[in-house]
Amino acid sequence: MKVVATNRKAYHDYDIYDKYEAGIELKGSEVKALRQGRVNLKDSYVRIKDGEVWWLQGHISNLETTYSAFKHDEKRPRKLLLHKNEIAKLAGYTSEKGYTLVPLRIYFNNRNRAKLEIAVAKGRKLHDKRRVMKEKELKKEAASAMKRYGF
């Protein structure tokens, strides 16, 4: 499995509850750009509309070598491929207040198919972000102290 890009900001801004693997409906030039790592997940999000799951604002850059007739819109909505029962589960989660769908990472699986890992998440407040950062820092200090004293 070759990870192309991760959305590190999602782990900071959201509490992650459930993860799903979704296929992506792409054009040829988009696949080639993905293989070169020309993708940005930072400001993208996932929505369910009319029983279909869509990845919105995902930025896949055009290649300089692509002929102008084959160039794609860099931020076009891309359909995600999931089973009906998974879509129903996700719709149930997102109907609850505060829950949303966020893309976590994009990668090529062992069969060389582009996949997007999406998660059901709930936004964190500022004080929650600070608390989580403090806990991580304490954990890191404890681990280094244990290592230093040979435990």
Swiss-Prot record:
It holds the Pfam family SmpB. This is SsrA-binding protein. GO terms for molecular function: RNA binding. The lineage of its organism: Bacteria, Pseudomonadati, Campylobacterota, Epsilonproteobacteria, Nautiliales. One of its GO terms (biological process) is trans-translation. Its main location: cytoplasm. Keywords: Cytoplasm, RNA-binding. Gene3D superfamilies: 2.40.280.10. Required for rescue of stalled ribosomes mediated by trans-translation. Binds to transfer-messenger RNA (tmRNA), required for stable association of tmRNA with ribosomes. tmRNA and SmpB together mimic tRNA shape, replacing the anticodon stem-loop with SmpB. tmRNA is encoded by the ssrA gene; the 2 termini fold to resemble tRNA(Ala) and it encodes a 'tag peptide', a short internal open reading frame. During trans-translation Ala-aminoacylated tmRNA acts like a tRNA, entering the A-site of stalled ribosomes, displacing the stalled mRNA. GO terms for cellular component: cytosol. InterPro entries: SmpB, SsrA-bd_prot, SsrA-bd_prot_CS. HAMAP family: SmpB. It is found in: Cytoplasm. It comes from the Bacteria. Coiled coil: none annotated. Belongs to the SmpB family.
